[in-house]
């Protein structure tokens, strides 16, 4: 019986001082790791938005060929069901078909239209879309013959972050409709 009580006497847990030392070390490590993690999360959001944009441009080009019609990628309106007369691409974008040659509006008669609706981008990102003359665009038009249409030139989409040290990524849509990421 005496042996059992000695064994129980030796079993102990952490002392309060040991616990406080472990908590202090964990706090120091967290303080060092959090800023690096925030940068990683921001870079991931930017790359994710870029991949989504390139994917939507390629899908718009493919849909134009598949449907043998004109397809628009344009700034999303507030309702999310068509194009806005704005160059603020941060509000999101839609991909839809249009029937008119120079139209910047979705064809509401076809269904489903728009067939891609993207929500607003993260506020830490900026997206600008310009033509060859650096004029801001609200619409990119892709035609069934793999071109952007009469009088269209290449469009350049630039996605960058608002934080210091952010890298700007550029996507070019050639007048032939080819999408390339730089």
Describe the role of every protein-language-model region:
Residues 2-6, 28, 32-58, 62, ...:
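N-terminal helix-rich module
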Residues 3-27:
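Glycine-centered recognition micro-motifs in short, flexible terminal segments and loops
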């Amino acid at each position: 019986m005496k042996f059992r009580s000695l064994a129980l006497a030796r079993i102990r847990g952490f002392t309060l001082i040991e616990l406080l030392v472990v908590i202090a070390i964990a706090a120091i490590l967290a303080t060092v790791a959090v800023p690096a993690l925030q940068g990683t999360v921001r870079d991931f959001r930017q790359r994710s938005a870029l991949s989504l944009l390139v994917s939507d441009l390629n899908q718009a080009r493919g849909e134009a060929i598949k449907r043998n019609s004109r397809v628009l990628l344009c700034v999303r309106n507030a309702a999310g069901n068509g194009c806005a007369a704005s160059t603020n691409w941060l509000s999101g974008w839609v991909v839809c078909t249009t029937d008119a040659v120079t139209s910047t509006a979705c064809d509401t008669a076809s269904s489903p239209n728009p067939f891609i609706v993207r929500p607003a981008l993260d506020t830490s990102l900026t997206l600008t879309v310009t033509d060859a003359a650096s004029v801001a665009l609200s619409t990119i038009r892709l035609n069934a013959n793999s071109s952007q249409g009469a009088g269209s030139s290449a469009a350049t989409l630039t996605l960058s972050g608002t934080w210091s040290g952010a890298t700007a990524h550029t996507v070019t849509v050639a007048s032939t409709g080819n999408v390339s990421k730089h």
